[in-house]
Amino acid sequence: MKTLIVFNHPHEGSFCRAILEAVQHGLKESGQQSGLIHLDKDGFDPVMHAKDLKAFALAGKGFPEALDEVDPLVRKYKTKLEQTEHLVLIFPIWWMNMPAMMKGFIDKVIFPAIAYDMKGGLLKSRLPIKKVTVISTMNTPAEVYREHFNNALEGNLIKGTFRQIGIEEVEWVSLSMVKQAPQEERE
């Protein structure tokens, strides 16, 4: 199985970075082929510019050549996604949602003519992705995130994005209170 990890955290010493290294080690040990998109190191621009929005509209209407106008990194990421069966996203939760770079990745890459087609008002995945695993860290207690913030990420990303385009196997691993965790637990 080809696994692609999309990682977003600017601090090299972060808990997310330790998770990334553990996931990469586990994949290597099990002999699985994997790749990495490191949004921070790539200098990914999360902003949906006017040319991106125009390409989005045209691609959604059946003009895939509109993708020639989008950010070259988006086209590079498209190629990687087309070879992916298991997508893993790793990022922190800031202000109850994913950081801007990860949100920009979703906005600009999970895009008509890249990730899905629109037919009769329904979205259908174009990608070979069979499973998505989302690993997030936060300092908010899990019950507070669930009860007071309605599991915002589940509605936005799990149901509102991946399941909506037809990827049914989506797992969310939410690690809460990470700053308060003892060092041995973090390792």
Regions found by a protein language model. Give the residues of each.
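A short small-residue
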Residues: 1-4, 136-139, 173-179
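Short, glycine-/small-residue-rich phosphate/pyrophosphate-handling segment
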Residues: 116-163
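Glycine-rich phosphate/pyrophosphate-binding loop and the adjoining helix
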Residues: 65, 144-187
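Residues at the starts of beta-strands that form the adenosine-phosphate
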Residues: 2, 33-35, 130-132, 168-169
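N-terminal beta1-alpha1-beta2 submodule of the flavodoxin-like/Rossmannoid cofactor-binding fold
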Residues: 1-114, 180-187
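Structural signal for conserved beta-strand scaffold positions within catalytic alpha/beta enzyme cores
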Residues: 36-38, 134, 172-174
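Structured loop/turn residues at beta-strand edges in well-structured enzyme cores
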Residues: 82, 100, 127-130, 168
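Short, structured loop/turn "capping" segments at alpha-beta junctions
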Residues: 112, 116, 167-170
